[in-house]
């Protein structure tokens, strides 16, 4: 297996221009494909997840052109639901942001499509979304294990009253919201359980509005969507920088700055993960907000005890930043880490212990007490881009760290380690 050893980093300083947001990129691609008119997307993320979405759109007959660096995409909208000519199988890797929205969108009209992916994708639950789509008339068959991909979709979604469980993943609600306006009837979506990752729903609603569709949001408990609508191209759309990707550089500055400025997101960003900066500030770092940047300057870091349900992806970065904070850090209400690219609660606890931390792994929380001095360790990444990026922060100590399978960052940030090196000074 490939590995990368990072030598101790004495100081970080500089500016990072963030790649486009994964969440925004894949939503925007699908809406542009469903819309009337031509859409030009700029600052599109070039990553595995986005490639899976683009490959699926190609197979579904959507025509688009990509710039050489794959960050500018011109899409000719289909002007309505996507249809496959004949039976079709789409392979979506481990891209939840492609699997969930497509599983819903391809239930409009009459299709015969199989959605499948990597072995890990077949372990990531989708039952709550399927249950909701079936309530709206969709015909869906599980081809292997009940409640998990692969799925066979045979159209039939017409709208009506649907309930969806919001407690595992907000992507199920996102998928329903994006699909419902194109259904023939009105759809009323009721949320069961506590809705996780609420800011990601705001991204969805924001993008739908950009493409000309507004819905009635009743305190995130119920959403009323008029049927028979269509999406309209906004013309050109700039994809925000990825706020989850910003977290590693901001945390690095909090630990070993200098000052690091990330551009492409700012105080008005629609991504909830910008709130990560508030957590660093609470721990003792200095944060400065601009319209299109956030900067972080080092501070003496203290432990925190916080509910992280609103920023589950960026919260992982706090787990490794906790190695540099005084005291015991507790991150709460993060059960949905367990259904991500890997079981992130288990993975994080296991690897933090390797570097010497004392860790308590709960059902939906993690408690981390840093050691006096970090141990050298080989970090397993579980084919999870965020594990690789989080544990790069260990090098901000006087101990090197080896990251196994470093190329797994290609899911969202192919040149992450080059960018980290660019702002780092060796110890």
UniProtKB/Swiss-Prot annotation:
InterPro entries: Enolpyruvate_Tfrase_dom, Enolpyruvate_Tfrase_sf, EPSP_synthase, EPSP_synthase_CS, RNA3'P_cycl/enolpyr_Trfase_a/b. The active site is at 313 (proton acceptor). Its EC number is 2.5.1.19. Pathway: Metabolic intermediate biosynthesis; chorismate biosynthesis; chorismate from D-erythrose 4-phosphate and phosphoenolpyruvate: step 6/7. SUPFAM superfamilies: EPT/RTPC-like (SSF55205). Keywords: Amino-acid biosynthesis, Aromatic amino acid biosynthesis, Cytoplasm, Transferase. GO terms for biological process: amino acid biosynthetic process; aromatic amino acid family biosynthetic process; chorismate biosynthetic process. It is an enzyme of class 2 (transferase). 3-phosphoshikimate binds at residues 22-23, 27, 169-171, 197, 313, 336, 340. One of its GO terms (cellular component) is cytosol. The record marks 408, 411 as: Modified by bromopyruvate. Optimum pH is between 6 and 6.5. It is found in: Cytoplasm. Its main location: cytoplasm. It catalyses: 3-phosphoshikimate + phosphoenolpyruvate = 5-O-(1-carboxyvinyl)-3-phosphoshikimate + phosphate. Changing residue 101 to G: Displays a slight decrease of the affinity binding for both S3P and PEP. Decreases the binding affinity of glyphosate, reducing the potency of this inhibitor. Coiled coil: none annotated. Changing residue 101 to S: Displays a slight decrease of the affinity binding for both S3P and PEP. Decreases the binding affinity of glyphosate, reducing the potency of this inhibitor. Is insensitive to glyphosate but maintains high affinity for PEP. Monomer. Belongs to the EPSP synthase family. This is 3-phosphoshikimate 1-carboxyvinyltransferase. It comes from Escherichia coli (strain K12).
């Amino acid at each position: 297996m490939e590995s990368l050893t990072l030598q101790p980093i004495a100081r970080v300083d500089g500016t990072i221009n963030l790649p486009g947001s994964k969440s925004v990129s894949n939503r925007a691609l699908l809406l542009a494909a469903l819309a009337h008119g031509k859409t030009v997307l700029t600052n599109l993320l070039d990553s595995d997840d986005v490639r899976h979405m683009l490959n699926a759109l190609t197979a579904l007959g959507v025509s688009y052109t990509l710039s050489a660096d794959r960050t500018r995409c011109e899409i000719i909208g289909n002007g309505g639901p996507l249809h496959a000519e004949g039976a079709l199988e789409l392979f979506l890797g481990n891209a939840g942001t492609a699997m969930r929205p497509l599983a819903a969108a391809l239930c409009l009209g009459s299709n015969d499509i199989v959605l499948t992916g990597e072995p890990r994708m077949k372990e990531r639950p989708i039952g709550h979304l399927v249950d909701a789509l079936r309530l709206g008339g969709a015909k869906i068959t599980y081809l292997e294990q009940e409640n998990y991909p692969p799925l066979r979709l045979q159209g039939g979604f017409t709208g009506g009253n649907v309930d969806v469980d919001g407690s595992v993943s907000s992507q199920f609600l996102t998928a329903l919201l994006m699909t419902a306006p194109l259904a023939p009837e009105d759809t009323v979506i009721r949320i069961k359980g506590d809705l996780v990752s609420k800011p990601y729903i705001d991204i969805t609603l924001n993008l739908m509005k950009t493409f000309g569709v507004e819905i009635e949001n009743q305190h995130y408990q119920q959403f009323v969507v008029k049927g028979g609508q269509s999406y309209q191209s906004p013309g050109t759309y700039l994809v925000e920088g990825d706020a989850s990707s910003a977290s590693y550089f901001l945390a690095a500055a909090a630990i070993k700055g200098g000052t690091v400025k990330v551009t492409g997101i700012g105080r008005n960003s629609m991504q909830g993960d910008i709130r990560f900066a508030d957590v660093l500030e609470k721990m003792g770092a200095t944060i400065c907000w601009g319209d299109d940047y956030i900067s972080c300057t080092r501070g003496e870091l203290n432990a925190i005890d916080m509910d992280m349900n609103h920023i589950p992806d960026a919260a992982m970065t706090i787990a490794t930043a906790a190695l540099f904070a005084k005291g015991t850090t507790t991150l709460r209400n993060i059960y949905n880490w367990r259904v991500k690219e890997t079981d992130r609660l288990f993975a994080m606890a296991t690897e933090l212990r390797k570097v010497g931390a004392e860790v308590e792994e709960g059902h939906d929380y993690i408690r981390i007490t840093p050691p006096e001095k970090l141990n050298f360790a080989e970090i397993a990444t579980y084919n999870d881009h965020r594990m690789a990026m989080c544990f790069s922060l260990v090098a901000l100590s006087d101990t090197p760290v080896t990251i196994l399978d470093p190329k797994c960052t290609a899911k969202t940030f192919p040149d992450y380690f080059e960018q980290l090196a660019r702002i780092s000074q060796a110890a």
